[in-house]
Amino acid sequence: MASILTLDGLYAEVPKFLPEALREGCAGKNPLSFYIQQILNLMGCDGNEYHVLFTSSSEEANTHMIMAAVRRHLLRTRQRPHVIIGAAEPPSVTECVKALAQEKRCVYTIIPLKNFEIDPVAVYDAIQSNTCLACISGTNAVVKTFNKLQDISKVLRGIPLHSEVSDLVYQGCIKQNPPADSFSINSLYGFLGVGVLGMKKKVMQGLGPLIFGGGLRGGSPNIPGIHAMYRTLTQQRPSMKKINTIHKLFMKTLKKHQHIYLPIGGVSAEDMSAENSAKDIPSTDVPVGPKGLPGYILFSVGHRAEELQKKIFTKFNIKVGRIVDLQEILFRIKIPQKYWETLLFIQLRDNLTKEDIKRVMVVLMHLDTITPRGSLPPPSYSSSFS
């Protein structure tokens, strides 16, 4: 039975006979509406910002998006549309674009990998007056390195960005919640698999009528497959929604307290010690995070280091002076004694356990109850958080 996507992003028609087991959590609601909202929640997306279409696979979602963008451009002008694609895109993207180019319905530019990722500057340089779409995945095939989707989206300046984000979703990489105008996900669930095509409202208004014909038909609503996708997401990434909650609480606390940002990519403990000595700042003697990982530093203004150490590190069983072998990394950095502040470095990785989440939440909730006092200039070796 065909399903129709209405303008509010929900399916108007649903199967009338569903096994009770597949209605888990629906509480009498439209099953598809329920799954749409839950999947968006797991991704950390705003349900009011995105429209969702279920397809047979992410491959179908990718081709729908490319075809719609090319068709819209051809309807507006006789100039052949230009598509930007990454060098490590899935076959559904490259084959679709190349097939359209062979039919002389579009031209395309392939952006090569630089240091195993797509360089936003190269994307900017590839933009032409007839560019109608950029297809850059969240992770690059084979090498599985992350692309800077946020930066790429900025340089495109209004040109739609479509991204395959299956790996980002299944790895729980919340810091790259799809900033793309549209995204696709594959369920990774075998023969019952379905795909997801998510589109922001502004994209839906322009390209939506060109997808599935003018009627916005999304094919048969494969409820068992959609349910299986939802269950797979919740089982493989049981902490994804909580990770997003932690992230929001962390950002809220970060804005509340005075803070600094300490980039740690490629920095070793020895480098930090040498740099601190050079600037007359006491050495931390604390190892920094693994090379290449970003770092956030948060400190509470007006509270002595010993006070917060007792309340946080001792009470919550988190040791100072070493990287905790968990998914959150908390350590104290010494700065000139006249400031006597505590700096907390929190790094969220992709495989948090429930116990890890509880410990991070306890620390953040405690910090959220502290009222900032006074003012503290950041150490000269750190840059301000942006």
Curated annotation (Swiss-Prot):
One Pfam family in the UniProt entry: Aminotran_5
Localization (cell): Virion
Regulation: induction: Expressed in the late phase of the viral replicative cycle.
Superkingdom of origin: Viruses
Keywords associated with the record: Virion
Coarse class of the protein's main subcellular location: virion
Cell membrane keyword on record: no
Reported cofactor(s): pyridoxal 5'-phosphate
Residues reported in the UniProt entry to bind pyridoxal 5'-phosphate: S58, E59, S184, I185, N186
Disulfide bonds: none
Keyword presence, Ribosomal protein: no
An example Gene Ontology CC term for this record: virion component
InterPro entries, sorted: Aminotrans_V_dom, PyrdxlP-dep_Trfase, PyrdxlP-dep_Trfase_major, PyrdxlP-dep_Trfase_small
Signal peptide: none
Annotated PANTHER family: CYSTEINE DESULFURASE (PTHR11601:SF34), CYSTEINE DESULFURYLASE FAMILY MEMBER (PTHR11601)
Family: Belongs to the class-V pyridoxal-phosphate-dependent aminotransferase family. NifS/IscS subfamily.
Name listed for the protein in its UniProt record: NifS-like protein
Organism: African swine fever virus (isolate Warthog/Namibia/Wart80/1980) (ASFV)
